[in-house]
Amino acid sequence: MHYLLSRLLHQRQLNASAQLFNVSHYDVITDMSNTFTCLKEIINDPTYPFNKVDQSVVEIVIARLTAAIRETGSIESYAAELVDVLDEVLKHPMTTLNEKSRDVDSPHCKIASDLLSSLFLHYGKKSVMTLTIPVALKCLNSENAELVKNTTSYISLAAIHNGKSLSSHALQIITKVVKGNYSLIRVLPHIYQDNKEPFHAQLSQLIDLLQNQEVDCSEKLSLLQLASMVANTKPEVLIPYLPRFDVYLLSPQLSTALLNIYMSLISQNRTKALSQFLPTLKLAAQSNEFVNNRTTICKIIANIGRVSSTLASEAVDELVLMARHNLAEPQLLQSVLNEIEAIGSMYPTSLRRHVAFFQTLPSSRTIERILGHLNLNNENIPLEVKKQSTESLLSKNSKVFGNLITSGGRTVFEVCESPTVELCELDRNTHSLAMQYQNNRSSGSLSRRSHASIAHSLGAGTHGPYSDINESRELSMISMPSSSRTNVHLSQAASSSRGHSLPQTFSPQAMTQIQMGKDGRVRPVAGGRRPVQWPAGSTETTFPAHLGPVTTSKMCALNEEDEKWINSDRNDVVYKFVEHRKNKIRRYIGEVNTRFPIPVQCTVEGSKSSKHRMVIHFSCQTRSSPCCVFTKEYLFAFKTKYPAFWLHFMFLQMECSAITQFGEVAGKDSQQYQTLEHCWKCLPSSTTKNVLFDTMITAAFPNSKDQDKLIKELDEAGFFAYFTMDSSNNMWNCISCTNPEKVKYFVEEGGVEKVLEGQLKEKKGRWRFLKRWNTKYFTLSSAALNYSTQHMPTDSRALLPSIDLRSIRSVRSLGRGKKARKSLRKAFEIFTADNTSMILKAKDEKNAEEWLHCLQIAMAHARRELS
């Protein structure tokens, strides 16, 4: 123990305290264990609360010890001793009565506050927090309200990086929350994943806090975030409490978080539980306060509509109303129409009352699919299947087509163009209908040309007659493949005794192709997204329906381009991979985006003589501030060591966006896919391992360990210093949009006011290790970085030598990342456009980070103005 410490602790000589702060830090921390032992003896003395000298000695010694530990970076070595002293202090009362009989902080409380602040200063060190948190939680039982408040703030801060350490105390924390320590609510989402059972057991009491007036909005958002996590993990626990959430759907502050809960339940196939909230969702959709949430509300309403036919009609009515009110917003309108089409594919009757509205919309593929489920010309002719009766089927058909299928005759369709319309999904009763024809064919003397290729179209065209699809039993009319632009010519065979022609408006569209093989089974024709074309040459096919005649169709040969398109589409492995995993991809990308964002752009840098490296670029996702740093003109970029993972994520994000916006999968022929594939091909074989791009992206999704590697890479690149996750809208904001008041000086007119100034030590030149540090006074403004050998007044700053911010190529920390140097933890390096560099060292790490951040922001705004 240092002799000055000994004089203070053993002899209580307060005059030695002034000299103690001039002693070297390393001399102070020598023989620390004896020092702490002496401190505990003084603290536990019964006379300590009344002895002012002892109180002063303890406060001085603790202040000097914590300062020495902090400056020498030895907190991990002495954390156990500090925590032990804190535990001893907490055994004493934290309040005492003053002369006016009021509760005030006791001398022990002051020591506890100092120790807590010193320990939680290192909240990012898990070894320190593992020791500190169990003892700090004891402070929450204190009768001192101020100490409880400060400890709660410390624990909330530590929970960000130490969720596992806190999770073992989850029940204790939940109990404190329920009893009134509402500030601890912010901790709950951080510890749920590591210890779920206490939350499930106490969920009812936690949800009741939403109605408590003392709980502020941010704390309610944390509760809803916790509920969303429960919905993703164990939805059956949350579903009984859903009615309590309904009232918050119309709250502008809480609606987004509640909609996230609903989306989580939908992803877990619990949509039926949300049907009771459809009236409230309709009110939210019609309100102008929830404009930003309309796309999400639209998706939730559509998913509820797919639960039953009754809900389908109600949902379509609301979606059509939403479409009418948002005709000027193409992106939202497209999302609404996609959801309407999805409901219509299951319950076509829900679309009938809105036929006129759909016809007024501009023609598009989505509108064609919607109209493909509607009967525009023959709504008054419902067709039914009665007990699978073939006779009833034929009688109904004859009412529509006349004697299109009759004994002794043959109706021939000559189509001069190949069909160009899209395929719709195969009706679920197509198989039963086809089996009726098969059974009748086998029992009767049917005349047919061939069993080899028998095809027809089932479903309804945009301009063709068809029957509506009922809820439990549907029947699709038989129509020959044709497009709305194809002329249909009917010719009756000479042996036919009577002839009937179809109405002039009849122009059926091919909706679904099926074929009958030699085994007599009817199957959908395999293919891609476009209708199956007929093979080269004139092919005549027959579909036996009853005794006597058969219906025959002739199709012209495909041209070479269409045939090539179909073959490539059928072989599109990427399309098939994504098509079968749509929901999985959307859920996966949603989870990934909460951990880190996905790049908006990738480039490959390098020449023939240098190693190629991929650069990934990120932008601010909200751009809510006019002084936003990372926009389309200027992106946050760095070279990555894991191009395969990033390209895989970019591919999944591309598919997720295509599915969400257009309801379709982006195949290998899309421009975005080809761009990503080109980046992959530009990388060296040592990186790609000669793996094809489509093989790489159709492999298993990157797991949590792979994601941790990317998070570490982002951290080393300084990404999290400039971007933060906004939990209210699940977007990554740049520092300018999160705190616009901090960067306003960079974008103000003039740009000459100082933003940051102070002394920095500088080194220049190639052989920097041979030179000594030169202390200079630097001033950073939005215009330039000025420096001199001494402090200069503002009016003389323009005459100082300066570095143009637009000429700075990059700034990097020398105390962070893989190549960090322990001797330069307080330093950062500036690279300029003329290939020169300058190393600057601040007085401490905090000051170095401040300079680094301000320089990055100033550079970004300078480059944005230049572009």
UniProtKB/Swiss-Prot annotation:
Keywords: Cell membrane, Membrane
Residue intervals of the PH domain: 753-860
Presence of the UniProt keyword Membrane in the record: yes
Compartment annotation: Cell membrane
Record bears the keyword Transferase: no
Gene Ontology MF terms in the entry: phosphatidylinositol-5-phosphate binding
Bilayer disposition of the protein: Peripheral membrane protein
GO cellular component, one term: plasma membrane
InterPro entries referenced in this protein's UniProt entry, alphabetically: ARM-like, ARM-type_fold, Melted-like, PH-like_dom_sf, PH_domain
Any Gene Ontology biological process: regulation of signal transduction
Region named Disordered: 480-505
Family: Belongs to the MELT/VEPH family.
Domain notes per entry: The PH domain is required for membrane targeting.
Name of the protein this chain belongs to: Protein melted homolog
